[in-house]
Amino acid sequence: MEIITVMHTARSATIEIRDGGRHFTRSPYRVVVNGQEVMTTEKVITSLFGLKPQTAYQVEIYDGDRLLGSTAFTTEYEFVTLDVTRFGAKGDGLQDDTHFIQAAIMACPENSRIYIPAGTYRITSLFLKSHIRLELEEGAELKAFKDREKFPIFPAMLESYDEQDEYNLGTWEGNPLPMFSGIICGVNVEDVIIYGQGTINGNASKADWWDNPKVMRTAFRPRLFFISHCKDITLQGVRFCNSPSWTLHPYFSNQLRFVGLVVENPADSPNTDGLDPESCKDVEILGVRFSLGDDCIAVKSGKIYMGRKHKTPSENIHIRQCLMENGHGAVTLGSEMAGGVVNLTVEDCIFRHTDRGLRIKTRRGRGKDAILSNITFRNLTLDHVMTPLVVNAFYFCDPDGKTRYVQSRDPYPVDERTPVIRKMTFENMTCTNCHVAAAYFDGLPEQKIEEIVLKNITISYAENPKCDVPAMSEGVEKSSRRGMFVRNVSHLVLDHVSISGQEGEPLETIGVDKVEVRE
C-alpha cells in the first residue's frame, strides 16, 4: 500500500491511501499523526486539520495494530492570523457580517490566514484577493442572505475606451449576460486556498432563486463560488450547499484544485450543478462527494460567441476518487462547449443513482471549435445509473433546440457551426442495476464520432427497471433494459464488453463504418 501527501498548507494536509479502493478504502484505517491517533478513516482522500505552521508531521496508517504505510511533510510558514471576530464579525446568525469579513480579507498580508471560528455568519458577496489563506473552522457557516437586492451585479460586457475590445464579467449558461456576483467571488486573483471543516451555505432553499429559474430578474442567479480569470486556486475540505444555481463555477481560470469537498443541493433544485469548469486549464478534482439536483460535474467552454472570440477549451481536467450521487449526469461535457474540451480523464470514481454516467451534450450550432478530443473514463463503479454512457449530438437545449436544423437526422453541410467529437475511451467499468439502456451514442451524420473504444466493460440491469428516455433529443423513445445503441460512428471497438439481461439485441448500430469485437 502506498500513502502519499496530496497537499498541505500551514494548518492542514490531505493524504491519499492507495489501497485499491474507489473513493472509499477497502477497510477502515486508523490514522496516527506524530504518534497520536487522530481519527479512523474510510476515505481514500483524507484531510487533516488543526495542524501547526512550520511543523514536521509523520502520518501513519494502521489496519488494527499493523502498520500499512506512512507519509511525511512539513507544514508551510504562516506570518499572522486575522480572526474575523476581531474585525467586528459576530457569527450570531443575525448581523450582516459581510463588511467585517471583507475587511479582514483586504487587510490580510501574504503568507497569512483569515480565520473564521465556529458560528453562523450572514453574508452577501465576499471578494477574494491574491495570496491569502481562508480557514473555516468546524462549526463555522457562511450563510447567504436571501434578498437579491443585497447582491452586487456583474455587467455582461464593458466596452474598452478605444472601442476595440471588451471586458466580460457576467455570464449565464455560456453567454455573456448580467448576473448577481457569487457568494464567494474572485476576479483576476491568484494563489488562494480556502480550507477547513466549515460550510458555505447559499441558503437558496429559503429564498426565491429557484422560482422561475430561467427568467432573468434584474440579473441572472449567482453561483455559490465564482472565480473569473484566476490561477492557482485550491478548495480543500469545505462543504458547499443550497446554491442559487451552479455551485462551483471557475471561469477562464487555470491551475485549480478541488480536494475532499462535499457539494450538496436538494434533488429537485434547478440547475444546481456541482462543479462546472468553463474554459479552464489544469484542473484536478479529487475525493469530492456530490449529491445534488443537476449534473455533478459539467465541463464547459461557452456558447458560440465566446467559443469563436476566445477559442479557449477546457483542457487537462483530471477527476478521480470522487463519489457522485443523485444528479442528472455524473460527469457531463457540454452542452455549452463551443471552445472544446480536450484531455479529460475520469478514474477511480463511483457513480450512484444518477440519470447518466458519462453525458456528452452537443448539437449543431456549437461551432467548429467545439472539439471533444482525448476523453478517457476508466476504473469506475456505476450502480443504479439509468443509462451509463450517453453521447448526444442532438441535445435540444436553447430556444432553437427543437428546430429542424438541430434535430434532423439527415446530413447537413459541414460548416463553421458543426461540432466535432474525436476519440473517447472507456475501460474497466462495472455497471450494475442499469435501468434504461446500456449506452446511447448518437453522432451527427455529416460529422460522425471518430472513434469509441470500450474495453473490459460489464453491464447488467435492475430487477424492476424504470422506463425513460436515454437521451434528451427529439424522436428518442422511452425504454428499459435496452442494449447499446450506436449511430453515426466511424470506428467502434468492443473489447471484452459484456451486456447481460437486456431486452432485445445487445448492440444496435446505424451508420457505423467499422466495428471491431474482441473477446
Enumerate the predicted regions with their spans:
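Extracellular/periplasmic carbohydrate-active domains that bind, remodel
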Residues: M1-E519
